[in-house]
Amino acid sequence: MAWFKKSKAPIVPVESKKVKMPEGVWRKCPHCNEIIYAKEIERNLNVCPKCDYHFRISARERIALVLDEGSFVERDAGMKSVDFLEFKDGKRYRDRISAAIKKSGLNDAVIWGEGAIEAQPVVVAVFDFSFMGGSMGSVVGEKITRAVEKALENRCPCLVFSSSGGARMQESIMSLMQMAKTSAALSRLKEAGLPYISIMTDPTTGGVTASFAMLGDVNMAEPRALIGFAGPRVIEQTIRQKLPEGFQRSEYLLEHGMIDMIVRRPEMKARLSQMLRIFMKQ
């Protein structure tokens, strides 16, 4: 007689009950890798409560955070890019524009208009990275230029929040021309004695950094923002050297005198208000 008798009936594994979790309930911080309740991040102005990492936000979210409630009047909302070169890489440029409009709900990578910060009138232009990486084409350059010209007309400060991968390659020389165009407009603002405050957020790179983003009377940045011309990976491959820790981050730039200050998102409005009072002698 066998000591152990095999059961004839097969062993059926107990099915585990899978709980379906709705998408977007939790978010992973790319800096500290913590899994955090999404609403907790939103309550903290899209800043990680564990490590202070500043998540990217949309242009409209930033406007709501910085400007007085109900004060913003948008200009040139219907302005759209045109595929004048009939550019095509893996995809036609006109199709990329249509896809970006559908994804972001915007007609291009910048929103600009008039508003107020603690009752101080300002003209503000804000990049939205979700529209083709915040790249600068003819529409972006025109909007920035119009914002500067409106500040001249209103005799008030101009603020630009940058978040861009640089010039838009699909527009070739027309996108590069915007660097000179925006810089020339800011030169006229400077001659008029009106303040221009540049706020660089993650990331601010390429032709945007090489033009108006670095021309502020005060150059501010959010914590850990990537700021530079070429990206760190491209630089390492070119010079074949390992870059220093934190290279091109806002803290590194502040340490080396490239920017004036780093301001956390919850403190941004108060700091801007302070700067505006100093500049406008109020």
From Swiss-Prot:
Pathway in which the depicted protein is active? Lipid metabolism; malonyl-CoA biosynthesis; malonyl-CoA from acetyl-CoA: step 1/1
Question: Which residues are in coiled coils?
Answer: none
Q: Name one Pfam family in it.
A: Carboxyl_trans
Tell me the cofactors it needs.
Answer: Zn(2+)
Keyword Metal-binding, does the record have it? yes
Listed GO CC annotations = acetate CoA-transferase complex
In Gene Ontology terms, what is one molecular function of this protein?
A: carboxyl- or carbamoyltransferase activity
Task: Provide the catalytic activity annotation.
Answer: N(6)-carboxybiotinyl-L-lysyl-[protein] + acetyl-CoA = N(6)-biotinyl-L-lysyl-[protein] + malonyl-CoA
Which residue ranges does the record assign to the CoA carboxyltransferase N-terminal domain? 25-282
Task: Specify the residue ranges making up the C4-type zinc fingers.
Answer: 29-51
Q: Does the keyword Nucleotide-binding apply?
A: yes
EC numbers, comma separated = 2.1.3.15
Q: What class of enzyme is it?
A: transferase
Stored SUPFAM superfamilies? ClpP/crotonase
Provide the primary localization: cytoplasm
Record keywords: ATP-binding, Cytoplasm, Fatty acid biosynthesis, Fatty acid metabolism, Lipid biosynthesis, Lipid metabolism, Metal-binding, Nucleotide-binding, Transferase, Zinc, Zinc-finger
What InterPro entries does this protein's entry cite?
A: AcCoA_carboxyl_beta, Acetyl_CoA_COase_Trfase_b_su, ClpP/crotonase-like_dom_sf, COA_CT_N, Znf-ACC
Q: Which family does it belong to?
A: Belongs to the AccD/PCCB family.
Q: How does it assemble?
A: Acetyl-CoA carboxylase is a heterohexamer composed of biotin carboxyl carrier protein (AccB), biotin carboxylase (AccC) and two subunits each of ACCase subunit alpha (AccA) and ACCase subunit beta (AccD).
This chain's function reads: Component of the acetyl coenzyme A carboxylase (ACC) complex. Biotin carboxylase (BC) catalyzes the carboxylation of biotin on its carrier protein (BCCP) and then the CO(2) group is transferred by the transcarboxylase to acetyl-CoA to form malonyl-CoA.
Q: What is this protein called?
A: Acetyl-coenzyme A carboxylase carboxyl transferase subunit beta
Q: Which organism is it from?
A: Syntrophotalea carbinolica (strain DSM 2380 / NBRC 103641 / GraBd1)
Q: What is the lineage of its organism?
A: Bacteria, Pseudomonadati, Thermodesulfobacteriota, Desulfuromonadia, Desulfuromonadales
